[in-house]
Amino acid sequence: MKTRLVNSLAALALLFGFCAPALAQQVPDAIINNDGIGFSRMADGQLIAYDLVAAYDEHMIVEADCSAYKSRLQGVDWCFASAANQSSFEAATQDNGRNKYLPFVGGHCALGMSVGNLTARGDPRTAVRIGNLLVLNGRFEVRTSFLQDTERNIDNARLRYELAIAAGNLKVNE
């Protein structure tokens, strides 16, 4: 009996020893991206990128042209619909890497993040500018729920996002 217990514990230790590196690799990115492209989504196996400058400045969801207009910031490529929008994005980038156009809480679903869901992805089509924040949610119905208590949801999402990064539960994109 004692031998079987020791063998079982050894097997569990071995199993967790092999799983630990795999679990460590499962930490979600701080900035949501698809194949390295931020403010994008997958549809029918195709990557669709959107112009976050158009979403922020013009309140319009516009598809971007990654082959013509692309900038890299915080380990992610950002695509634009025009050279003017790319220039606006680049001009807004500060020395510390901050940029007003970057999606709030890294493009995660803001309502999901406000309740601690670190894996809920924001859909760029739901983007809405609230003050100086470009806020995404997973679906339009979720955005509606988020907007019912915007201030509290923004505060909770910001806090949980910052705590998740500090605790290593979200990894900073490189």
Predicted regions mapped to residue ranges:
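Bacterial N-terminal signal peptides that target proteins for export
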Residues: M1-L9
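Bacterial N-terminal signal peptides
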Residues: L9-G17
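Sec/Tat signal peptide C-region and signal peptidase I cleavage site
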Residues: C19-A24
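Charged, low-complexity intrinsically disordered segments
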Residues: Q25-E174
